[in-house]
Amino acid sequence: MKGLCFLSAVPMRAEQSDRSEMVNQLLQGDTFEILEQQEKWSRIRCDYDGYEGWIDNKQWRVLGDEGQVTSDNRQQKPQETATASLLRAAGAPPTATADSPAEVAEHLYLGAPYLWGGRTVMGIDCSGLTQVCFKACDLRLLRNASQQATQGIAVASLDEAQRDDLCFFHNDQGRIIHVGIYLGDSRIIHASGMVRIDRLDTTGIYNEERHCYTHHLALLRRMPRKS
């Protein structure tokens, strides 16, 4: 069975409880497969990136074979995605795609607060930021930073980096824990406390307000453009 997110944003949780960690958000127009349905909660798999989690049964609708909502006496086509709504608000037609993920991040998300699992201007995490900005450019990324680090092609060094390349960062154990979008000129836009622009060098992200490195550079990847 397929479902549709008809609200602006719906939390996906690690467990079937409102107190459980929010691991992701569905945005309006997102579709998904129902893996397990209980009285109050359903476990789903997102069609876009395969991400799994639990959502409240009051916050989704059944999607019929022809793309129509079939429950709650509704008969309507899925509404436009939140990304399309944002692009339209920025002056682009609803069906338009942007040219640069970095531009989307700068123009639509700069200053948005950090929220673990978030994917909207009201709150967004590092890999949520990269995913929605690349989606606006018709480039598909997986949900987590560690997953995104397996996509695209490797960039050998920061000297060879181009605007819109993905920059990944590791913890002391070598695990990928953070991602941002390279802006060029040794600058990166990323979500850390808020969506912000910081300096980037071969060591990592340098926060000039705190006078320290906050993230250590691990690798860079480039997503090929669709022909």
Please report, for each region that a protein language model flagged, where it lies by residue:
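Boundary regions of SH3-family modules and the immediately adjacent low-complexity/disordered segments
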Residues: 1, 45-112
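Aromatic- and glycine-rich peptidoglycan recognition patches
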Residues: 2-14, 93, 183-227
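Beta-loop motif signature
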Residues: 5-28, 71-91
